[in-house]
C-alpha cells in the first residue's frame, strides 16, 4: 500500500521507533512484542497472525500500542489510550475531602505521565459555597478544583511542546497532549457554570466537557 506524504509524517512524528526505517518495521516490532508473552508453542503463529493483521492495514492497533509496544526505554508508558477514573477506587469513606481530591489528582498525573487519556465524572465534588465542617470556611466548588486538573495536564505535557535542537536517541518528538474528559451530572448545582466554562478563552482547554 502506497502511503500519502501526510501519513508518512504522522508515522515519523508519532509512532516510529528508533532505528525503524519503514512502516513494516513498526508492524514487525509490534507483532514480535505481542507474541513474546505467549506460550512458546504458540509464539510463531501469534506473531504471523498479528503481523498479517497489521500489514496493509487489515487491522490497526491503538495509538499507544503502535507507539510503545516493544520499544526499549518506554516500559513506563501505557498500552491503553484512555482511562476512566472512579473516585470510589481510592478507598476513602469520605471521598469528597481534600485528601480524596488530591489523591484523584495524583492518579490523573500518573495517567497522563504514562501517556494515557483521562476521564472522570466530577459530580462527587460538592458545589461552590458549601460549608466545610471543622474548617469554618466554604468549598470553592467543582470548577475551581477542575482548574487543578487543568494545570496538572498543562504542566506534565509542557516539556513536549518545547522546541529543542537535539533529540536523544529513543526520545519521542511528540507525546500525547494531556487529553481529558470531564463530566458533570445535570442535577449538580454548578451545571450552568460548567456548561458555560469554555466560553472563556483558555479556560479548561485541556478538557472535553460533557453533561451527564
Predicted features along the sequence, with ranges:
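Extended catalytic cores of very large enzyme megasubunits
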Residues: 1-212
Amino acid at each position: 500500500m502506497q502511503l500519502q506524504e501526510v501519513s508518512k509524517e504522522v508515522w515519523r512524528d508519532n509512532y516510529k521507533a528508533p532505528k525503524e526505517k519503514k512502516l513494516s518495521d513498526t508492524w514487525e516490532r509490534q507483532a514480535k512484542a505481542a507474541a513474546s508473552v505467549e506460550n512458546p508453542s504458540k509464539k510463531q503463529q501469534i506473531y504471523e497472525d498479528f503481523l498479517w493483521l497489521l500489514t496493509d492495514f487489515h487491522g490497526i492497533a491503538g495509538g499507544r500500542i503502535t507507539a510503545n509496544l516493544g520499544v526499549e526505554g518506554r516500559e513506563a508508558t501505557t498500552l491503553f489510550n484512555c482511562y476512566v477514573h472512579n473516585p470510589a477506587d481510592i478507598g476513602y469513606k469520605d471521598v469528597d475531602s481534600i485528601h480524596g481530591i488530591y489523591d484523584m489528582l495524583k492518579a490523573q498525573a500518573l495517567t497522563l505521565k504514562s501517556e494515557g487519556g483521562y476521564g472522570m465524572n466530577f459530580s462527587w465534588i460538592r458545589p461552590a459555597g458549601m460549608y466545610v465542617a471543622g474548617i469554618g470556611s466554604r468549598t470553592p466548588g467543582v470548577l475551581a478544583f477542575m482548574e487543578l486538573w487543568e494545570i496538572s495536564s498543562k504542566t506534565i505535557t509542557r516539556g513536549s511542546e518545547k522546541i529543542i535542537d537535539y533529540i536523544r536517541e529513543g526520545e519521542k518528538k511528540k507525546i500525547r497532549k494531556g487529553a481529558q474528559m470531564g463530566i458533570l451530572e445535570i442535577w449538580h448545582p454548578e451545571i450552568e457554570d460548567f456548561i458555560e466554562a469554555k466560553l472563556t478563552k483558555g479556560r479548561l482547554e485541556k478538557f472535553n466537557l460533557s453533561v451527564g
